[in-house]
Amino acid sequence: MFAAKVLVVDDSPTMRQFIVFALQRLPGLQIDEAGDGVAALKQLSSEKYDLLLTDINMPMMDGLKLVGLVRNDVGYKKLPIIVVTTEGSNVTRERALGIGANEYLTKPLQTAKLIAVVRNLLDPERRRD
């Protein structure tokens, strides 16, 4: 694994803690956290990230709106995005992927699956322009 910066966005401190703990198994990751989409946008505007992992249902700004705004930002058009949510419907999944998410994972999260998806999205061979 190589050095990469990840932003984890979820309004649940417990879920953020779980995700951060799981991702710490991957060497070289620097992990930042945000509690909602508005806070995430502020961090994205001041820091360069290699991966965004976001919940959907959050106050202030939901994850789908966040994904759409990030995809419209020239600096982040190719940023890998994982949506993590309790919403398991195909409609929500298709909507998230349609607006630009690369992956859609449902809660409760399986640590091994999360790590595999993150590894795959951060693979330098996949990220070449």
Task: Show where each model-derived region lies.
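C-terminal output helix
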Residues: L109-V118
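Receiver (REC) domain active-site loop signature in two-component systems and cognate sites
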Residues: M58
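His-Asp phosphorelay/catalytic-motif detector in bacterial-type signaling
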Residues: K48-D50, G75-P80
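Conserved acidic segment of CheY-like receiver
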Residues: A3-T14, I19-L23, L52
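Acidic, metal-coordinating helix/loop segments flanking the phosphotransfer/catalytic sites
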Residues: E33-L51, E94
